[in-house]
């Protein structure tokens, strides 16, 4: 404690400063183009992928990026196709955010964030045409493959959609389906015990997110940065660097120059 002109001044360690006034702490860091995890304002976390990590799944992958850890296991089951799509299979993605990955998530029903991300994953699979669903059909009107993609966050630190998608995409690339045929005499599917085939992906799709804090764009925001931000923008590109999807949350409207900048950055990162 120091005394200046008879007035006592308090000094705090960075950790205490962060707890007392998190907004001012983040603003102080960003003015120096640095963040609490050491990245610059425009820097994305590097993703490390380990695939085929679950021996009992048809496909799997675990990704790590900073403090984030997401794992995806894909299980293939056979079901009767829907009446309105008799020659197609389908994919069911689901994200689990449990109290084990962050204290902000509570036991019980899925959190709002988990439900929103799961829905966005499902819509993205449809909009991107990543998988030809007809390739999942075994026999029209009788049998098709259903891919249940369970994505579990083991440790959470922001940008849930980006990393859930990264884990899902990495796992899809490893899927092996048993060679299956429809036996009309037995009226059931016969699967080969050893022969398998991959799921053909039409392109590669990547997701890039930003948040806005104090009029500053934060690439790949952490959990703490998301809590303090007012706007969020996600841009998804395919391997041709064409836009697959744009997700905007918070705020009023996207400034054209801001959107253009984010698109340019995303394309440079692909």
From Swiss-Prot:
Q: What is the lineage of its organism?
A: Eukaryota, Fungi, Dikarya, Ascomycota, Taphrinomycotina
Top-level division of the source organism's lineage: Eukaryota
Where this protein primarily resides, as one coarse class?
A: cytoplasm
UniProt KW Nucleus keyword: yes
GO molecular function terms noted in the UniProt entry: 3'-5'-RNA exonuclease activity; mRNA 3'-UTR AU-rich region binding
* General function of this protein: Non-catalytic component of the RNA exosome complex which has 3'->5' exoribonuclease activity and participates in a multitude of cellular RNA processing and degradation events. In the nucleus, the RNA exosome complex is involved in proper maturation of stable RNA species such as rRNA, snRNA and snoRNA, in the elimination of RNA processing by-products and non-coding 'pervasive' transcripts, such as antisense RNA species and cryptic unstable transcripts (CUTs), and of mRNAs with processing defects, thereby limiting or excluding their export to the cytoplasm.
Q: GO CC terms for this protein?
A: cytoplasmic exosome (RNase complex); cytosol; exosome (RNase complex); nuclear exosome (RNase complex); nucleolus; nucleus
Q: Which gene encodes it?
A: rrp43
Localization recorded for this chain is: Cytoplasm; Nucleus, Nucleolus
Q: Does the keyword Heme apply?
A: no
Pfam families reported in the protein's UniProt record: RNase_PH, RNase_PH_C
Q: Partners and quaternary state?
A: Component of the RNA exosome complex. Specifically part of the catalytically inactive RNA exosome core complex (Exo-9) which may associate with the catalytic subunits rrp66 and dis3 in cytoplasmic- and nuclear-specific RNA exosome complex forms. Exo-9 is formed by a hexameric base ring of RNase PH domain-containing subunits and a cap ring consisting of csl4, rrp4 and rrp40.
Q: Which family does it belong to?
A: Belongs to the RNase PH family.
Note the coiled coil stretches, chain numbering: none
Give the GO terms filed under biological process for this record.
Answer: exonucleolytic trimming to generate mature 3'-end of 5.8S rRNA from tricistronic rRNA transcript (SSU-rRNA, 5.8S rRNA, LSU-rRNA); nonfunctional rRNA decay; nuclear mRNA surveillance; nuclear polyadenylation-dependent mRNA catabolic process; nuclear polyadenylation-dependent rRNA catabolic process; nuclear-transcribed mRNA catabolic process, 3'-5' exonucleolytic nonsense-mediated decay; nuclear-transcribed mRNA catabolic process, non-stop decay; rRNA catabolic process
Keyword vocabulary terms for this entry = Cytoplasm, Exosome, Nucleus, RNA-binding, rRNA processing
Q: Which InterPro entries does the record match to this protein?
A: ExoRNase_PH_dom1, ExoRNase_PH_dom2, ExoRNase_PH_dom2_sf, Exosome_comp_Rrp42_subfam, PNPase/RNase_PH_dom_sf, Ribosomal_Su5_D2-typ_SF, Rrp43
Q: What is this protein identified as?
A: Exosome complex component rrp43
